[in-house]
Regions:
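Extracytoplasmic gate region of multi-pass secondary transporters
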Residues: 34-39, 163, 242-319, 402-407, ...
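Helix-loop-helix hairpin linking two adjacent transmembrane segments in secondary transporters
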Residues: 155-217
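Intracellular juxtamembrane helix-capping segments at the cytosolic ends
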Residues: 41, 126-140, 147-148, 366-379
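Central cavity-lining transmembrane alpha-helices of secondary-active solute carriers
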Residues: 55-73, 304-317
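C-terminal membrane-cytosol helix-exit motif in multi-pass small-molecule transporters
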Residues: 198-230, 452-459
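C-terminal transmembrane helical hairpin of 12-TM major facilitator-type secondary transporters
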Residues: 257, 263-266, 297-374
Length: 469
């Protein structure tokens, strides 16, 4: 047993909750692989513009963030297991229904993909996402920064496993991790890939959800005593959502979280097409099928490597924040992310490109780990699911604005023809839009630098009037 005090019945080993959290979050983290689907979908629906093909990625993140509010509220009320299970069923069902997208014309297909992949998928992700985070924080008050990092690390790692899986399913061939050919997979095409992934997500999330349960009332880890507030400092109380929203600190945190998510999600959702633009721009058209395939594979690999740093950042920055403080860690992250975004457009060599996007991914992962911990530090854990749901709307706003900025501020450099093969194995010529993303990168970089300044001004909130003594 790992508890003392209030629990009269045996207490489960709290690390089983972490196992369930990782299973769920790895599956949910596949939301970050959209850039792998982008080029194949444009190849099928050539009438889609850059903004249109980005739209499902924006909407899935917005639906995700909005659903976190209600998911947090429901898990506070009904417990994490049932809410996470329902989320897995909705996400898996939405992905399975998305496989019918190819049966529609271009306009109707976009609407169908938005309804199934984006809206249903986002609602399912949001319902399940907050459950493992809130549960882990309650089981690990002694390691709050580290454990929130672990709880969301799987979310960042999801793309590492599922980006190359989606790439292999779409085009057939080897499933590759870090350049190693592990096994071969049949060619399913982009639409049947939605079906396969939907089934995987549904089963995995439902299984992981069964490991989630809240600790008994009054639980605290063996040998741990809660730290006492500093003399003259804010008391440690639990804010209701209404009380939290009334504090200026909430809105300052929201703005900075929004800035970090705008930069991070801009890179994550565009990592593959941005690299393809960098690689194709200096080549002489038409691009041969094998050359284009190698460039696309490198783009998928960039998504996977980015996912490693996204995931690692959640653990690394969580641990750092436990030692140095949340505020110091956030300031360093915003500065690093801002500088990386400002320099990213000049990183045209593949190795440099990986360095740039991985720096952004490392910081973005840290935001996802530290903001739940900050909300718990500032506003208590009693209403953490609901409170963090409101904070998480900043992520949804960043998920809309980041990819939108990349599409809206992109300047078309060229329309380059490349060779591909159709379902019958015949060579066909398609067009790839080579874009310049400098304005989008610079805008997001400046936002991060401003966020660093705002974070420097941050102070803990005073307790609400009803709780003040």
């Amino acid at each position: 047993m790992e508890a003392q005090g209030a629990a009269a019945r045996p207490v489960m080993n709290r690390w089983w909750v972490v196992v369930g959290a990782l299973i769920i979050q790895i599956s949910l983290g596949a939301v970050y692989i959209w850039s792998v689907f982008q080029t194949p979908l444009k190849g099928v629906f050539q009438a889609w513009t850059e903004t249109q093909v980005t739209l499902p990625a924006q909407i899935v993140l917005a639906a995700f963030a909005l659903a976190v509010i209600f998911g947090g509220r429901f898990q506070d009320r009904f417990g994490p297991r049932i809410v996470a299970t329902i989320g897995g069923l909705i996400l898996g069902g939405g992905m399975i229904l998305a496989c019918f997208t190819g049966r529609f014309s271009a306009g109707a297909a976009l609407v169908w993909l938005i309804i199934t992949y984006a809206v249903l998928g986002g609602l399912g992700i949001g319902a399940a996402y907050v459950c493992p985070i809130a549960t882990c924080v309650k089981w690990f008050p002694d390691k709050r920064g580290l454990i929130t990092g672990l709880a969301v690390a799987g979310f960042g790692a999801g793309a590492f496993f599922f980006a190359p899986l989606a790439k292999a399913f779409v085009s057939g061939g080897y499933y590759q991790l870090l350049g190693a050919n592990l096994f071969t997979l049949p060619k399913l095409g982009v639409f049947n890939t939605f079906l396969a992934l939907g089934l995987i997500f549904l089963v995995a999330i439902v299984i992981g959800a069964q490991l989630l349960r809240n600790p008994p009332a009054g639980y605290k880890p063996k040998g741990w005593d809660p730290p006492q507030p500093a003399v003259g400092g804010p008391a440690r109380v639990d804010f209701t959502p209404r009380q939290m929203l009334a504090t200026p600190q909430f809105w300052l945190l929201w703005i900075t979280y929004f800035a970090g998510c705008t930069a991070g999600l801009q890179v994550i959702m565009k990592a593959s097409p941005v690299w393809q633009s960098f690689a194709i721009a200096p080549l002489t058209p038409p691009i041969q099928a094998d050359t284009f395939g190698a460039i696309a594979a490198a783009g998928a690999m960039a998504v996977a490597v980015l996912a490693i740093f996204n995931s690692a950042g959640r653990i690394v920055w969580g641990k750092i924040s436990d030692n140095l403080g949340r505020k110091t860690a956030l300031i360093v992250m915003f500065l690093l992310c801002g500088v990386a975004m400002l320099a990213l457009n000049s990183f045209r060599a593949y190795g440099l490109y990986l360095v740039g996007i991985c720096a952004v991914g490392l910081c973005f992962g840290g935001y996802l780990a530290l903001y739940p911990a900050v909300v718990a530090d500032f506003y208590g854990t009693k209403h953490l699911g609901f409170n963090y749901g409101w904070m998480f709307t900043a992520y949804g706003a960043g998920g809309i604005v980041g990819p939108f900025l990349a599409a809206w501020l992109m300047r078309v450099h060229a329309e380059v023809p490349y060779l591909s093969t159709d379902a019958a194995g015949q060579a066909v010529e398609k067009l790839f839009t080579v874009g310049n993303y400098q304005l989008a990168f610079v805008t997001a970089g400046i936002m991060c630098l401003v966020a660093a300044v705002l974070t420097f001004l941050l102070k803990a909130p005073r307790p609400p009037r009803a709780a003040a003594v």
